[in-house]
């Protein structure tokens, strides 16, 4: 149905790329959909391959975004960069000398699991501070319900002030991590996208 809707013949479909966050849903975050746990037992690649009869490539969402950046974005300008992806969780990915670096277990750049201190001084995983889930929780605590990024731009002045305060906290939280990445990897750039 989707191919028909966008006007692409099935004969032109040569493969499918799927981007999924790592550790879904083991890394419990607020505002997850009720059936999020199904991703622990669903292997999407064979399901799509059997249905569409094309190769299926499944990749971590931050790594997939980084590969896209390498092909179509600032990765064409920078050969060594670190990519920070802020979505429902927090991810990262590393490119060294024009090559995506996966690490020994394919998990390089896993920022969200690092520890950091929140505004009260308590140690937490930094994705519980720097992620859209964390932002939505901060807004919800003030009575503002948001469930998608496009809803953020239409918020009133109080909502925008909460977002601005969250950005300040996010910057403070990421600072030590970004300094460590700069010292250890020395990238030409750190790209932060959502």
What do these predicted regions represent?
Residues 1-14, 27, 50-54, 72, ...:
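ATP-binding/phosphotransfer module of carbohydrate and carboxylate kinases, centering on a glycine-rich
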Residues 2-15, 19-80:
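Glycine-rich phosphate-binding loop and adjoining helix at the ATP-binding site
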Residues 20, 86-88, 194:
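Short secondary-structure boundary segments
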Residues 23-24, 89-90, 135:
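Conserved sequence/active-site signature of Rossmann-fold short-chain dehydrogenase/reductase
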Residues 42, 94, 156-157:
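Flexible loop/hinge segments that line or gate small-molecule binding clefts
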Residues 74-130:
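Glycine-rich phosphate-binding loop of actin/hexokinase-like ATP-binding domains
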């Amino acid at each position: 149905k989707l191919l028909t809707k966008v006007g692409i013949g099935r004969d032109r479909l040569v493969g499918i790329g799927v981007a999924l966050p790592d550790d879904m849903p083991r890394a419990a975050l607020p505002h997850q959909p009720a059936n999020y746990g199904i991703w622990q037992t669903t292997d999407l690649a064979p399901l799509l391959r059997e249905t569409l009869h094309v190769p299926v490539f499944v990749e971590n969402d931050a790594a997939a975004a980084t590969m896209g950046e390498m092909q179509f974005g600032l990765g064409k300008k920078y050969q060594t960069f670190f990519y920070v992806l802020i979505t429902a969780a927090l991810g990262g990915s590393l490119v060294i000398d024009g090559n995506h670096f996966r690490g020994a277990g394919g998990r390089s750049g896993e920022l969200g699991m690092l520890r950091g201190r929140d505004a009260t001084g308590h140690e937490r995983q930094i994705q519980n501070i720097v992620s859209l889930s964390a932002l939505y929780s901060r807004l919800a605590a003030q009575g503002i319900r948001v469930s998608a990024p496009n809803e953020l731009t239409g918020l009133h002045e109080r909502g925008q002030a909460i977002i601005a305060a969250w950005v300040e906290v996010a910057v403070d939280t990421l600072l030590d991590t970004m300094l460590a990445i700069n010292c250890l990897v020395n990238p030409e750039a750190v790209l932060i996208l959502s």
